[in-house]
């Protein structure tokens, strides 16, 4: 597969890991090829290896200002954390008094390795102390009053020097005064991983007992780290065995890692090649990146105060965009950033920002951009240029009002699906008349929808809710105020002025959208005001034939479920009638577009749902009476467990998420497939802005997930066409392929691992 645009990688995720400094890599390689002795051996090769280890330790003591404290080499920060916690809690256990309740304190914004390790050793050692999180304020600073109150009864307190997500640093001197002023003997561990090379450290001048560090966060290889132990602090080996490290940490020393650290320490001590920028220069780099973000995304919000943050980290959010959307966008531009800690990449929001009390949208949209001291001016310049192109790409797909274009703006036509959590909004646009209708608009999408309407110069015909939603406020009001000020409509947004059409000898109200009718059908049950909206061909309907494009069914039918009927305005008897009535009108193959999609299945039809939902199948086949349906529906709805602060589920899942068998290809297999089979269609399913930034020449088309339902509609009569889907990581392509297979597309495959693994191979 050949790339249309060759974009070099710009790596701005240094808080997750860093490339190995070339000189450090060379030193490591030397210890693998020539100076490969075991430091514990007494022959010359061993002595040479031991000299490297001793020299590295001596430099570590200098860098840390460790004085007479000890520096023990480990496999990384997590081992260092275990070492500090185990040592402290073993010693603390011996001082505990029976029948007294103790606590263990940690900062609420600590890396998850700390609280999880505390819970583990608290249980294993049978200490049974209360583990308490120290609150932080909106700037990420620890609550000194809380510490003063709780630390007298604490066995151990864990804080961090610099936060890995926000770059916020703690004033260790002020913190020490609070801690020692209220408990002179409590064991104190400080996670210093992100402080190395960014903050001055004079550990011997503090009462910090334990401080773990990691090599790969500062240009050394993965698998090497070290931990500082204050002179006189208790110590329990985490790893016992051959007695290496003076019996403090057994296991053959990682000589290549030590050799690399040796080079890094030279840079920190100004004895190297001078590749590390000073603090002033790093601040200028941050300012340049911040300005580029502001220019590209004028509404950007920074999630931390630069005044109490190291200059190598920027944490920001862009209103209206999830962190995943920005991650995917930047990744398409080969600009590497993250949505938080790399140790928790599946988390959808930041617990750090939650602890700081920031609004939920900022936590859910947070992006971390981080660089190390070896970054160059050229790299920062390139990053700023790439950020500008990312904004242009969003403008290209009308998600941002950006000046300038990568290409002509993509004309919007057909159906687009938008999601917030499990809730869906639908926009249908007719390119000829430049008219549009929006179904079930979500308030979180108001700005995005308004931007699209403006950018595409679309006239909004109506913004309609399929029912009054219990789980969210409608975004219809904002849309109507901007585009439908003179329209008279009911409280769901259905216009007063309509056309009357006939379907199956029944009369319905309809409105026109280009060459389509949008027909309103009352389908009460989930709520008494529930309606379904059928988009169908205007000319065929006038000729007496119903040709359905889409059925916007609200919460009548959900993927794998039926809408709940246990609200005060629900009526299961009416749902029974609505299901039968709608199915008779539209048939079992018409595409149903619900207002919720909890399992990323996008769209469905009565045939697909009947095959996995026995209750629905029985209703449509007349196998249950209305009374039996009501009885079974009551039992079904008992499976819904509403929780305060969580998304309200609008139906109990009854179906199966069993994945269909899909053909999966790796990069070489796909290349061979394309060479021997010219009939296969290769489809890039990333969003248009990702596709615009970077895509391969072989692709027949771009079908983003937001347009997948539209694609399914267009391909309804060509389900045997062989399709191979590709995305960034393989996740979206697998989800899309499963959705297609579930609806009868029987020749679908995808690129396993996506662009990421294809490029690496």
Model-derived features: where do they sit?
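Pyridoxal 5′-phosphate
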Residues: 1-411, 421
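Active-site neighborhood of phospho(di)ester-bond hydrolases with catalytic His/Asp-centered motifs
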Residues: 75, 107, 191, 212-215, ...
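Short amphipathic alpha-helix with an adjacent loop that forms part of the alpha/beta core around
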Residues: 143-153, 448-456, 510-514, 672-674, ...
């Amino acid at each position: 597969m050949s790339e249309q645009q060759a974009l070099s990688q710009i790596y701005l995720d240094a808080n997750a890991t860093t490339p190995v400094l070339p000189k450090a890599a060379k030193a490591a390689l030397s210890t693998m090829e020539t100076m490969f002795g075991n430091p514990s051996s007494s022959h010359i090769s061993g002595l040479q290896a031991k000299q490297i280890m001793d020299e590295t330790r001596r430099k570590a003591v200098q860098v840390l200002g460790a004085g007479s404290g000890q520096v023990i080499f480990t496999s990384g920060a997590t081992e260092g954390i275990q070492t500090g916690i185990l040592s402290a809690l073993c010693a603390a256990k011996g001082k505990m008094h029976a029948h007294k309740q103790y606590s263990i304190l940690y900062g609420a914004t600590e890396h998850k390795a700390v609280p999880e390790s505390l819970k583990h050793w608290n249980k294993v050692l049978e200490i049974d102390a209360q583990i308490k999180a120290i609150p932080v304020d909106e700037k990420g600073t620890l609550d000194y009053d809380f510490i003063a109150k709780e630390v007298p009864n604490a066995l151990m307190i864990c804080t961090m020097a610099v936060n890995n997500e926000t770059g916020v640093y703690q004033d260790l001197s002020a913190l020490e005064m609070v801690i020692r002023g209220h408990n002179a003997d409590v064991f104190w561990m400080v996670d210093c991983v992100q402080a190395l090379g960014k903050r001055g450290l004079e550990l011997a001048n503090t009462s910090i007992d334990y401080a773990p560090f990691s090599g790969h966060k500062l240009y050394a290889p993965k698998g090497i780290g070290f931990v500082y132990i204050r002179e006189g602090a208790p110590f329990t080996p985490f790893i016992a065995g051959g007695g290496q490290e003076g019996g403090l940490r057994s296991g053959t020393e990682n000589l290549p890692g030590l050799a690399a650290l040796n080079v890094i320490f030279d840079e920190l001590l100004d004895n190297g090649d001078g590749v590390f920028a000073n603090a002033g220069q790093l601040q200028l780099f941050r300012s340049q990146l911040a300005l580029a973000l502001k220019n590209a995304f004028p509404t950007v919000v920074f999630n931390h105060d630069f005044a109490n943050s190291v200059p190598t980290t920027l944490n920001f959010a862009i209103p209206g965009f999830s962190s995943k959307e920005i991650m995917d966008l930047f990744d398409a531009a080969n600009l590497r950033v993250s949505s938080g800690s790399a140790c928790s990449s599946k988390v959808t929001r930041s617990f750090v920002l939650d602890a700081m009390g920031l609004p939920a949208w900022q936590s859910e949209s947070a992006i971390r951009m981080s660089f190390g001291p070896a970054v160059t001016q050229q790299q920062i310049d390139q990053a700023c240029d790439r950020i500008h192109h990312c904004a242009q790409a969003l403008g290209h797909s009308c998600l941002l009002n950006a000046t300038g274009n990568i290409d002509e703006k993509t004309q919007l036509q057909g159906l687009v699906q938008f999601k917030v959590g499990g809730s869906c909004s639908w926009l249908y646009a007719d390119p000829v008349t430049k008219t549009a209708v929006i179904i079930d608009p979500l308030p979180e999408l108001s700005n995005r929808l308004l931007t699209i309407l403006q950018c595409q110069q679309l006239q909004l015909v109506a913004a309609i809710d399929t029912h009054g939603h219990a789980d969210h406020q409608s975004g219809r009001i904002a849309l109507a105020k901007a585009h439908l000020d003179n329209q008279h409509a009911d409280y769901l947004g259905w216009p007063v002025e309509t056309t009357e059409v006939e379907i199956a000898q029944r009369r319905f109200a309809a409105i026109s959208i280009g060459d389509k009718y949008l027909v309103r059908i009352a389908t009460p049950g989930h709520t008494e005001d529930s309606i379904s909206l059928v988009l169908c061909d205007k000319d065929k309907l006038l000729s007496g034939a119903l040709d359905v494009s889409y059925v916007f069914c609200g919460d009548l039918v959900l993927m794998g479920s039926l809408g709940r009927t246990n609200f005060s305005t629900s009526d299961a008897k009416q749902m029974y009638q609505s299901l039968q009535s709608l199915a008779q009108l539209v048939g079992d193959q018409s595409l149903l577009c619900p207002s919720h999609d909890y399992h990323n299945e996008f769209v469905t039809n009565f045939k697909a749902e009947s095959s996995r939902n026995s209750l629905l199948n029985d209703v449509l086949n007349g196998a249950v009476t209305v009374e039996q349906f009501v009885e079974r529906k009551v039992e079904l709805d008992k499976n819904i467990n509403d929780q305060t602060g969580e998304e309200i589920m609008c139906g109990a899942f009854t179906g199966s998420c069993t994945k269909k068998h899909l053909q999966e290809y790796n990069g070489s297999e796909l290349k061979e497939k394309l060479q021997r089979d010219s009939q296969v269609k290769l489809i890039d399913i990333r969003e248009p802005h990702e596709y615009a930034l970077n895509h391969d020449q072989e692709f027949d088309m771009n079908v983003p997930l937001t347009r997948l339902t539209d694609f399914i509609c267009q391909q309804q009569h060509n389900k045997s066409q062989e399709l191979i889907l590709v995305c960034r990581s393989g996740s979206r392509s697998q989800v899309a392929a499963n959705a297609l297979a579930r609806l009868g597309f029987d020749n679908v495959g995808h690129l396993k691992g996506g662009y990421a693994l294809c490029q690496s191979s």
